[in-house]
Amino acid sequence: MGGLASGGDVEPGLPVEVRGSNGAFYKGFVKDVHEDSVTIFFENNWQSERQIPFGDVRLPPPADYNKEITEGDEVEVYSRANEQEPCGWWLARVRMMKGDFYVIEYAACDATYNEIVTLERLRPVNPNPLATKGSFFKVTMAVPEDLREACSNENVHKEFKKALGANCIFLNITNSELFILSTTEAPVKRASLLGDMHFRSLRTKLLLMSRNEEATKHLETSKQLAAAFQEEFTVREDLMGLAIGTHGANIQQARKVPGVTAIELGEETCTFRIYGETPEACRQARSYLEFSEDSVQVPRNLVGKVIGKNGKVIQEIVDKSGVVRVRVEGDNDKKNPREEGMVPFIFVGTRENISNAQALLEYHLSYLQEVEQLRLERLQIDEQLRQIGLGFRPPGSGRGSGGSDKAGYSTDESSSSSLHATRTYGGSYGGRGRGRRTGGPAYGPSSDVSTASETESEKREEPNRAGPGDRDPPTRGEESRRRPTGGRGRGPPPAPRPTSRYNSSSISSVLKDPDSNPYSLLDTSEPEPPVDSEPGEPPPASARRRRSRRRRTDEDRTVMDGGLESDGPNMTENGLEDESRPQRRNRSRRRRNRGNRTDGSISGDRQPVTVADYISRAESQSRQRPPLERTKPSEDSLSGQKGDSVSKLPKGPSENGELSAPLELGSMVNGVS
C-alpha cells in the first residue's frame, strides 16, 4: 500500500489520506491548494470532488517506513464497515498472534469488535500528522498551445518531476496550466529555472516521436505494397515540374484514382513509383504523371500551311490534343535528328496527349498532300487545254460589267485558301454563248443579260414570221412600258403626250377604210422616227412592238387601259372635260380572245373594247351635236346601211359587257361577213 501511495504516477494529483466521519482514513488526491483547504477527488470517484480542510488530510506514510508488529501494538487495519463503502485504514490493537494470523480489536467502535486478519492488511500507525497550511506547495506554468496535448500525458514529465523533486506534476485542463505540487519548498525555486528547458526538450522529443511513428507506418505500408501491383518510370529532369504540377496537382489527381494505394517520388533520380490494387489503376495514375517529348517530321513546303494564319491550325491541334506546348525546330537547332527536306515539330505533354497530337497532325498532312496532288492534276489539264487550242480563259472574261472581280476562278498562283475549293470548267466551253454560262457560281447568268439576248433574237425573228397586217400596234401604255429606259426600268417615265384622237375622228377614219385594222384606233401615241433616219424610211425593227416574255398580272395595263386612259382631258357627251373613267380590271385572256364568238354569248366572252363600242359612243355624241360634214358621197350609202343598226344601239357603251350588237357591227366594218 505504501508504494501505491507514494507513486504519484497512478493518478494526476498529490496522494493523501482523508479522514472520514467514522474516523477511518480513505485514499484521495489533491487537485488544487487553497488558503485553508485543498480540493480532493477520491479513488474510483466513490465520492464527489470537494474541498476539505487541512485538519482532515494527512500524507501517506513514507515508502521506507517499516516497523515490527507485536502483541498489544496499535496498528491500522485496511478494512471497511459495510459493502457500500470502500476500504480505509481503521485504528485497532493486536490482541493475539498465531503464525501469519492476527486477532485485532477495533478501537473506533463503541462496542468491542474482534476480527482475524492477515499481515497484508496490517500496517503500523501512520507517522505523518494532519496537514496544515505549510504542508503543501503549488507552482503553475503556462503551457504553449502546440504542447498542450503532449503535456496531458504525465509520462512526459517524469524526468522533469525527478529533477524538481516534486511530488506531482499534471496538466490542469480547465486553464491549460501545468500544476507542480510538492510538500517542500525546493521544487518551487527550481521550476522557474527548468521550465523553459523542459518545454524546449519536450518539443524536440515530440518531433522525434512523430517521425518514428511515421516511419513505423511507412514500414507497415511497404510490407503491404510488396505484395501489390507496382509501376515505376522515370521522367526527364526538365519535365519534373510539369509532372508534379502546380502545388502537386498532378500527383493529387493520380492519388485520387480508385485502387491507387501510394505514390512515391525519388527527387534525386526523378523516378515515380505507383502502388495499386489493380494494374489498371497503376496505369491510369501513370498516364497523369509520365510527361515526355516527341517530334513529328513535316515537309518544308507544308510548314506554313500546318501552322496556319496567325498559328490558327497548329493552335487548334494543341487545344484538341491537350499537349502542353509545341515547338518548331529551326535550321540552326540540331538537337534532334531530322530528315532531308523535313522540319521537326516537337510536342511536349503526356504520352496520350502526344499520341493524339501526332494523329491530328498526320491527318492534316495527308489532307494537304491530297490537295497539292489535285492542284497538280488541274495544272496538267490546263496545259493540255492550251495545247489543243482552247486555252485557259481567265476568270471574269465574258461577264457583265463589274462582275469579273467579285467571282471567278483563281489562277494557279492563287492563295492556298482557293485550292481547298472544288472548281469545275465544264460550263465555260459547252454553253450557249458567253452570256449563258451556268457552270458554277463564278459564272452564274444574270437576268438582264439573258433577257436582253432573248429579246434581240426575237427581234430578228419577228420580221420573218409577222407581217404588217397581222400584228397589233401596241397601245400607248404597252409602248411606254416596253420602251427601253436607263437601268432596269427604274428610271423616270417618258413625258406624256396628250391626245384625244378617238373622240374626234374615230368614226370617219373607220368608215373611210373599212378594210383597215380597227385596233389601230386604240393606239393614241404617234411613233417617233429615229433622229438619224430619213422621213420616208420605215422605223427600225427595234422600234417595233415586242411581246414580253413576262407573265401579265392584274396590275398590268392592257389594250383597254390604253384606250380609256389618255394623257389629255376626255370629252363627255356634253362636250365638257370630265375626269377619266375608272379602269376596268384586266384579264390576261382578253388579249387571246379577240375574235367574235359564233354563238353570240356575251357573258362568257368578256371581250375588250372593240370598234363597235367607239361607234356606239360616237352615235350617242352625234345626237347632241351636229353630224360631221366630212362625209363623202361614197360614205352615204355605207352610212345609210348602218344607220338603222346604229339607231338601235344604246346611248353609251355598256358597262356590264353586253356587246352582242356592236360585235356584229364591228364585223361588218372590218369587212368580214
From Swiss-Prot:
One term of GO molecular function: mRNA 3'-UTR binding
Compositional bias (Basic residues):
583-595
- Looking at the UniProt record for this protein, which Gene Ontology cellular component terms does it annotate, in alphabetical order? cytoplasm; cytoplasmic stress granule; cytosol; membrane; neuron projection; nucleus; postsynapse; presynapse
Cystine crosslinks:
none
Phosphothreonine modifications at: 411, 598
The protein's matches in Pfam families, at most eight in alphabetical order, are given as: Agenet, FXMRP1_C_core, FXR_C1, KH_1, KH_9, Tudor_FRX1
Domain KH residues, every copy: 232-261, 295-324
Q: How does it assemble?
A: Interacts with FMR1. Interacts with FXR1. Interacts with TDRD3. Interacts with HABP4. Interacts with CYFIP2 but not with CYFIP1.
Q: Which SUPFAM superfamilies match?
A: Eukaryotic type KH-domain (KH-domain type I)
Q: Where in the cell is it found?
A: Cytoplasm, Cytoplasmic ribonucleoprotein granule; Cytoplasm; Postsynapse
What are the start and end residues of every segment in region (Disordered)? 389-673
Where it mainly occurs, coarsely classed, is cytoplasm
Please provide the record's free-text comment about the domains of this protein.
The tandem Agenet-like domains preferentially recognize trimethylated histone peptides.
Report biased composition (Polar residues) as residue ranges.
411-421
Q: Where is the composition biased (Basic and acidic residues)?
A: 456-482, 620-635
Identify residues that carry Phosphotyrosine: 78
**Residues with PTM Phosphoserine:** 192, 410, 450, 453, 533, 566, 580, 601, 603
Composition skew (Acidic residues), residue ranges: 525-535
Name of this protein = RNA-binding protein FXR2
